[in-house]
Amino acid sequence: MLYTFPWREYMVEEKNNEEIRHLVRIMNTDLKGAKPVEYALTGLPGIGRRTAILIAKGAGVDPTATLGYLPDEEVAKLDRAIGNFEGIVPSWMLNRQKDLATGQDKHLLGTDILLTFREDINNLKKVRAYRGLRHERGLKVRGQRTKSTGRRGSTVGVSRRK
């Protein structure tokens, strides 16, 4: 069977003696078993393609292998490698560097990312920082121009003279 991705095609061979697992559970998330490991792991919030490839190589699993055909031992290796991701990569690759509360470098996964992000924005609002005020008012935060773009609401048309 041929799976086409925008940048690459993968041939997934049908194995007669083995049945594919269509859902594989890793880190309390159901991942699609028909995809290669490097793409299936991106279903976890906090893991992109680059980190997925590093996790697969760190676990000793082929990144292009189909996730649904992997034995349970290799899936467990992937699970352990995701939990130990901070030990595999340098600190500049982690998504939470110098945490405000602890000062440690972490890699957040799953709902922890959303909760931490929301908490950071609320802290900015609480201390009345410039970025927090922009978030409160619903304006652009990162220095973009706002004269003509970023407008919301219905447009006001121009009436023509008769």
Curated annotation (Swiss-Prot):
Residue spans of biased composition, Basic residues class: 140-150
Gene Ontology, cellular component aspect: cytosol; small ribosomal subunit
UniProt record, GO biological process: translation
InterPro entries: Rbsml_uS13_C (IPR027437), Ribosomal_uS13 (IPR001892), Ribosomal_uS13-like_H2TH (IPR010979), Ribosomal_uS13_archaeal (IPR019977), Ribosomal_uS13_CS (IPR018269)
GO terms assigned for molecular function: rRNA binding; structural constituent of ribosome
Keyword vocabulary terms for this entry: Ribonucleoprotein, Ribosomal protein, RNA-binding, rRNA-binding
Biased composition (Low complexity): 151-162
Region spans: Disordered: 140-162
Oligomer and partners: Part of the 30S ribosomal subunit. Forms a loose heterodimer with protein S19. Forms two bridges to the 50S subunit in the 70S ribosome.
Similarity annotation: Belongs to the universal ribosomal protein uS13 family.
Known role: Located at the top of the head of the 30S subunit, it contacts several helices of the 16S rRNA. In the 70S ribosome it contacts the 23S rRNA (bridge B1a) and protein L5 of the 50S subunit (bridge B1b), connecting the 2 subunits; these bridges are implicated in subunit movement.
Xref: PANTHER family: 30S RIBOSOMAL PROTEIN S13/40S RIBOSOMAL PROTEIN S18, SMALL RIBOSOMAL SUBUNIT PROTEIN US13
The protein, known as: Small ribosomal subunit protein uS13
